[in-house]
């Protein structure tokens, strides 16, 4: 990297959960972002909503989605906490995630976004937007139904998501700081 603070945007897509293994990893990520983003720049990303996954796994050790009896994703609880306290960081809360298109299971960690926002503020970042993929889907559907021509803009080749695909997708949120 040529100079610090050279980037107007830093992107971290589908990987923040790895930094929730421990505090040092998370602080290293945030320090790296802070060191390399220009004043007024944006830090954008996507991650699972850890609280939603925690709630999903409250009564089951494993949840999965299928299409035609084939498992397309599964999330397995590998932690012992019984409550998800948003005021605490909750580092190291492992889940095992399998996504068919990736083809293997990976260890990930629950993201406590409330804590993430709080620690980002300490580094001078303000949350601009935190939005669930479900809301993007609703907005997209509404735009397709209510466009000016009264015709759906939907690409005829676009496949409709199954309920199980939606369930996995809707666990994701985007953020902008």
Residue locations for each model-derived region?
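Alpha/beta-hydrolase-fold catalytic nucleophile elbow
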Residues: 13, 44-47
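Short amphipathic alpha-helical segments embedded in low-complexity Lys/Glu-rich regions
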Residues: 25-29, 48-51, 60, 133-140
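A short glycine-rich, Lys/Arg-flanked "PGG" loop and its adjoining helix->strand segment in the class I
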Residues: 17, 24-39
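A short acidic, Gly/Pro-enriched loop at the edge of an enzyme's catalytic core
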Residues: 1-10
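Core SAM-dependent methyltransferase catalytic element
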Residues: 123, 157-177
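Short "lid" loop at the C-terminus of a central beta-strand within the Rossmann-like core
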Residues: 16-17, 39, 48-53
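Charged, often glycine-rich, active-site loop that binds/positions anionic groups
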Residues: 138-159
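SAM-dependent methyltransferase
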Residues: 46, 50-123, 128-130
């Amino acid at each position: 990297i040529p100079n610090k603070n050279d980037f107007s945007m830093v992107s971290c897509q589908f990987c923040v959960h790895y930094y929730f293994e421990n505090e040092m990893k998370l602080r290293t990520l945030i320090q790296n972002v802070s060191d390399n983003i220009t004043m007024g720049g944006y830090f954008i990303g996507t991650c699972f909503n850890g609280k939603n996954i925690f709630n999903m796994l409250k009564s089951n050790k494993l949840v999965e989605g299928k299409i035609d009896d084939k498992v397309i994703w599964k999330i397995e609880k590998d932690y012992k906490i019984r409550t998800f306290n948003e005021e605490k960081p909750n580092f190291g809360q492992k889940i095992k995630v399998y996504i068919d298109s990736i083809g293997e299971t990976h260890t990930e960690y629950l993201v406590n976004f409330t804590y993430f926002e709080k620690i980002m503020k300490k580094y001078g970042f303000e949350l601009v937007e935190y939005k669930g993929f479900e809301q993007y889907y609703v907005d997209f559907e509404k735009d397709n139904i209510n466009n000016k021509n009264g015709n759906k803009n939907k690409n005829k080749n676009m496949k409709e998501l199954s309920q199980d695909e939606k369930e996995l997708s809707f666990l994701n949120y985007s953020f902008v700081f």
